[in-house]
Amino acid sequence: MGNCLQRTTRWQLDMQETPWNLRLSAKGRTCRYFRGWSCCHSVEGCSCLPWKNIRTFKARQESPKQNEGMTSAPVQDNANETYTEELCYILVDHEAVRGRPSVNPAEGFYENISNKAERHKESSRGTETEYSVLRFPSPPQPLPSTDDEYELLMPSRFSSHAFQQPRPLTTPYETHFSYPQ
């Protein structure tokens, strides 16, 4: 069994106020925490664990080694600004997902992991957990409004005399078009 790491900064927008109780049953830990975009509704063997990890840190770092434990570096616009990073963890049973063809397009959001990465590494503390990033597509951007936009279509070839003809003066709200003959 492996873990997949999902990082998001908008997860609070997609959630209702839910107490973070780790003693919930496996059925209670499913994707009711993540509405509308989670893989758990479509990938068998995946459950969302209600873990909340908030890291707050200053933009000014005294040593680069202090930042090694962080998953991302802060943007250093102002030395007095404070940044918050929130992580949400999703537990995936790779045994349930592995070995069957992918019929669901939602499963394409997993990063490919090499066979070497699928093995658990033995260490002095026991089996190490490996993380993979789940990638979700961004929502489609709305098209800009075309109410007051106009496009001027010009012929591909112009004759040289079309540019040499004198043009009458026009008011700002009046436009004249001349076509080559």
From Swiss-Prot:
It holds the Pfam family HGAL. Residues 117-181 are annotated as: Disordered. Coiled coil: none annotated. Disulfide bonds: none annotated. The keyword Mitochondrion does not apply. The keyword Ubl conjugation applies. Phosphorylation on tyrosine residues can be induced by IL6. Phosphorylation is mediated by LYN. Targeted by the ubiquitin E3 ligase subunit FBXO10 to mediate its ubiquitination and degradation. The modification Phosphotyrosine is found at Y150. InterPro entries: GC_assoc_lym (IPR031364). The modification Phosphoserine is found at S102. Highly expressed in normal germinal center (GC) B-cells. Expressed in spleen and, to a lesser extent, bone marrow. It is found in: Cytoplasm; Cell membrane. Its main location: cytoplasm. GO terms for molecular function: actin binding; myosin II binding; protein kinase binding. Residues 117-128 have a biased composition (Basic and acidic residues). GO terms for biological process: negative regulation of lymphocyte migration; regulation of B cell receptor signaling pathway. Keywords: Cell membrane, Cytoplasm, Membrane, Phosphoprotein, Ubl conjugation. Involved in the negative regulation of lymphocyte motility. It mediates the migration-inhibitory effects of IL6. Serves as a positive regulator of the RhoA signaling pathway. Enhancement of RhoA activation results in inhibition of lymphocyte and lymphoma cell motility by activation of its downstream effector ROCK. Is a regulator of B-cell receptor signaling, that acts through SYK kinase activation. GCSAM transgenic mice develop B-cell lymphoid hyperplasia, hypergammaglobulinemia and systemic reactive amyloid A (AA) amyloidosis strating from 12 months of age. This is Germinal center-associated signaling and motility protein.
